[in-house]
Amino acid sequence: MVERLVFFMAENEDKLEKYGQPEKLKQTSHIRILTIIGEVEGHENLGNNSKTTKYEHVIPLLAAAEEDNDVHGLLVLINTVGGDVESGLAIAEMIASLSKPVVSLVLGGSHSIGVPLAVSADYSFIVPTGTMMIHPVRMTGLIIGVSQTFDYFKRIQDRIVSFVVSHSQIRKERLTELMLETGELTKDVGSILVGEQAVREGLINEAGGIQDAFRKLHELMKAGRD
């Protein structure tokens, strides 16, 4: 009996480490919780010392949540520095296309590609001290210094801007202005929005915490049933 209990606890901790949700909550609640933390990993593995969100874990979980009749809503908890654009946008598109209500909550930060992830929900919250960093697309590694490279950068950036504008209340011109701000970050281009600032700019729906996020999600779930 003790061995079975130890095995269950170890298995549960393993699932919590991989997916950010304990098995017990899955069995007793109609709400699925998705955590997006650290750096959104792309097609290459990051170092063992980095906290990451792996798209190969997240995308199947979202697909399973869509097909699971016991799941009535999704709560997305976000504290990310950003990461791979393609993977981040893929997750954001999956969240936005779910037929079930989704609420997001920005806890520490939702930087870079974390911005589309935060606004992909049906309703979004940010804690008063939460931050969102908006900046142009950047790339590491070998870059060929030709005009086609910069055109490619612009196309990627246009995809991000288009997604954010279509899933929030911010205007395209204002988002671009914040993205290209040069007077705020000492060694970078872009802007940092804190708490209510993100709400005033139209990126986030409301400032609040976990209680507010659950309350709103239950409201959306009830409205869907009615």
Regions found by a protein language model. Give the residues of each.
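N-terminal organellar transit peptides
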Residues: 1-115, 119-135, 139-226
